[in-house]
Amino acid sequence: MDIFEVLTAIIKRKIILMRTGINEYEALIKAELDISSEYHIPLLDIQKLVGQ
């Protein structure tokens, strides 16, 4: 899985979470955690990709 696929997965998950009523920041954090555990990527690496 390359960088763009990871970022795309995070954005898609964030959008789904935002549609449930979660605000954008909380949705991003939850999406990062979900993708981190789903694809076995360290959370710190995902946060570097996103730019946090």
What are these regions (language model features)?
Residues 1-52:
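C-terminal alpha-helical interaction appendages
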